[in-house]
Amino acid sequence: MVQRLWVSRLLRHRKAQLLLVNLLTFGLEVCLAAGITYVPPLLLEVGVEEKFMTMVLGIGPVLGLVCVPLLGSASDHWRGRYGRRRPFIWALSLGILLSLFLIPRAGWLAGLLCPDPRPLELALLILGVGLLDFCGQVCFTPLEALLSDLFRDPDHCRQAYSVYAFMISLGGCLGYLLPAIDWDTSALAPYLGTQEECLFGLLTLIFLTCVAATLLVAEEAALGPTEPAEGLSAPSLSPHCCPCRARLAFRNLGALLPRLHQLCCRMPRTLRRLFVAELCSWMALMTFTLFYTDFVGEGLYQGVPRAEPGTEARRHYDEGVRMGSLGLFLQCAISLVFSLVMDRLVQRFGTRAVYLASVAAFPVAAGATCLSHSVAVVTASAALTGFTFSALQILPYTLASLYHREKQVFLPKYRGDTGGASSEDSLMTSFLPGPKPGAPFPNGHVGAGGSGLLPPPPALCGASACDVSVRVVVGEPTEARVVPGRGICLDLAILDSAFLLSQVAPSLFMGSIVQLSQSVTAYMVSAAGLGLVAIYFATQVVFDKSDLAKYSA
């Protein structure tokens, strides 16, 4: 009895809770990083054309952009014995587990269900890829909100998101490393099966372990029921009335969308410049990262993804994919190293020099990848892009913090910003609780890790709860419901949306470009070209007060 009580107290300790929550962060990033590496070659192997393969990769980001606001609003108003966040985390985790089962077994399931398995195999594989990408990226939203709920004190908030960023990086490293191993010749092959079955079986075990850790998270201890604002009559909902919850979530979403559209359209010029520069930089980097393994397998190793298993062409392609996975692992490792020293680099050279150097380094690395036929040079170039990855994770959000610390200087035309309404006039509705103020932004997404443990600027976590919110009045017409007010978190979320948008455009167009050019080198050429465009827009970013006079002239 005493031992059980001691274990219970140990698990409820703040550091233990921090580790338990961030275990899921680690598991999510392992699955997403391995998916980014392995899914494009897998789609090509089953006969999906290049242009359609890239479109499949865009399903998850597009659905994420649409569904994240609804999920954030629904999570904020959820009431249940397991808290507000974990039911959504578990539901999305089920989608991830289903995708990890479907992807390596699509052919086997199709053969069981119909005599002509090819169309069904493609459909099941696309369903699995879409589920993995969508559920994996969207699951970060309630997870980050859970961290914010549990660690409200500013100091604890910064520590929580430092550990969060580290687990993102660690998960990315492992996720990129696992596909680089030849599992067909490993000791696990007799038990788990082929390369795909071994890899996705391990991912399932890792992810199940990480999800199980959330069962021990004491969410209720840190999160009580949200009371309606004083003077407002919120509708009373039965804790088991799911239709009522759904109606409330949709109603709040309807109130949010017009307000968010208004806020985005009125984005100040300084933030707009930063958003465009970040979008172009992320588009270049994601074009490189999404299609790097396919480029190495087809372009560098001269393999053929659609060749029969066991043939020389297929063997070369598989070797190239494993070498590409190693290159992305090095990218993640270099990103982690630069994140750890980013603060010193900025203090030594300044934000402008470090940011421009990181953006300029990318087209150099991508250009070397296009021109060289050496595996060592191409792998080293992939590792160099980790510098760009690290800078994009951190510096744009530091600049946004600077803008908000000196609003009168950098954001003089912030119309309608009254500093927020009183608590008697508003009900807080969370929207897009992305990487929070007080931590390097991991962008989890999705795709890859590499934020590191850089101590964040104090101004980034000044509030007790690091969430993105807008104020919505309850029980009023739509026009009267919106209360003026715009904080740093909303602008950070808008900047963070550049990451999701950066995956959509390459997914739509890169396949067609490669088919027209008849060469996978077009992936790297396009990435280098986008990198050059990003350099131009990076030079237009406002880094200090002197830039305001220069760009307004």
UniProtKB/Swiss-Prot annotation:
Tissue expression, as annotated, is:
Prostate specific. Expressed in all prostatic glandular cells. Expressed both in normal and cancerous prostates.
The function of this protein is: Proton-associated sucrose transporter. May be able to transport also glucose and fructose.
Q: Where in the cell is it found?
A: Membrane
Signal peptide: which range, if any? none
- Enumerate the transmembrane spans: 19-39, 52-72, 88-108, 120-140, 161-181, 198-218, 275-295, 323-343, 353-373, 382-402, 522-542
**Keyword Transmembrane helix attached:** yes
Main subcellular location = membrane
The family classification in the record reads: Belongs to the glycoside-pentoside-hexuronide (GPH) cation symporter transporter (TC 2.A.2) family.
The gene behind this protein is SLC45A3
Q: Which GO terms describe its cellular component?
A: membrane; plasma membrane
Entry GO MF terms: sucrose:proton symporter activity; sugar transmembrane transporter activity
Enumerate the UniProt keywords alphabetically: Membrane, Symport, Transmembrane, Transmembrane helix, Transport
> Which PANTHER family does its entry note?
SOLUTE CARRIER FAMILY 45 MEMBER 3, SUGAR TRANSPORTER
Q: Any other comment in the entry?
A: Marker for prostate cells. May be used, in case of prostate cancers, as a target antigen for prostate carcinomas-directed cytotoxic T-cell lymphocytes.
Q: How does it sit in the membrane?
A: Multi-pass membrane protein
- Protein's name according to its UniProt entry: Solute carrier family 45 member 3
Q: What is catalyzed by this enzyme?
A: sucrose(out) + H(+)(out) = sucrose(in) + H(+)(in)
Q: Does the keyword Oxidoreductase apply?
A: no
Quick one: a GO biological-process term for this protein? sucrose transport
Pfam families given in the database record = MFS_1
| Up-regulation conditions | Up-regulated by androgens.
